[in-house]
Amino acid sequence: MTVIYPSPIFGPVHSRRLGVSLGINLLPADGKVCTFDCIYCECGFNADHRPKQPLPTREEVRSALEARLWDMQQNGPTPDVLTFAGNGEPTAHPRFPEIIEDTLALRDKYFPNAKVSVLSNSTFIHRPAVFEALNKIDNNILKLDTVDEEYVRVLDRPTGHYSIREIIEGMKAFKGNCIIQTMFLKGSYKGQDMDNTSDKFVLPWLEAVKEIAPRQVMIYTIDRETPDHDLQKATREELDCIAERIRETGIPVSVSY
């Protein structure tokens, strides 16, 4: 069963990577809006979840977030992180930069020790206002599943223009103020082998990671049901092997099995 998240606030949930996380979903509550259509997405395929509701407004997000933070301040739990995630790509929201400003102000008011994180597929980092907003937050988590141009079109299935070289250059512009997040998996999709744990995929990806020089790398594998049922988790051993190669570059890495 794939997951469509409430909007604009959900949780808190316990994140494998981030701790007690209050979710901020800038997409409609009844469907998906994303510039990727990943075959492993827990929210399902884009075509199966076309939203009829509008995007939440900046004002709706701010009001709902403040109400939830006030309640958590009174009744708990204390969040470790406020995470922009949900049903698609958060930076696709036209008021994303302003919503980040609101969120940072509310965080400082209610839970100044909490981090603000954004999980992004990196497709809008070339937009100056999006870039500036991401540069202000604590955890600018950017997806780079592969540097193979053919593989990315089967795994992540970008819905518009997508150039891996442009994405890498955009990530480099953060000058280390980013975290690279990469999905490793196995199995097949429509008869095509999808294993990206081999040297064929890992070594070029690792070169790109070194070029980007992020402050951290997060590698993970499938945790929830995927829309395609022929995909499989990467093994603990495979993830540990990839993690060790990252550590050898001097870049910190976290692994979610």
Regions found by a protein language model. Give the residues of each.
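N-terminal [4Fe-4S]-dependent radical SAM core
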Residues: M1-I39, F45-L55, A67-P77
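Short hydrophobic-acidic sequence motifs that mark active-site Asp/Glu residues
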Residues: S21-G23, V81, I141, I179
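Short strand-loop junctions, especially beta-strand C-caps/beta-turns
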Residues: N25-L27, A85-N87, M183-L185, I222
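Conserved Radical SAM active-site core
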Residues: Y40-K136
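Amphipathic alpha-helical segments in well-structured domains
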Residues: R58, I100, V202, T235, ...
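Conserved AdoMet/S-adenosylmethionine-binding subsite of the radical SAM
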Residues: A92-Q232
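Binuclear metal-ion centers of metallo-dependent hydrolases, dominated by the metallo-beta-lactamase
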Residues: T235-Y257
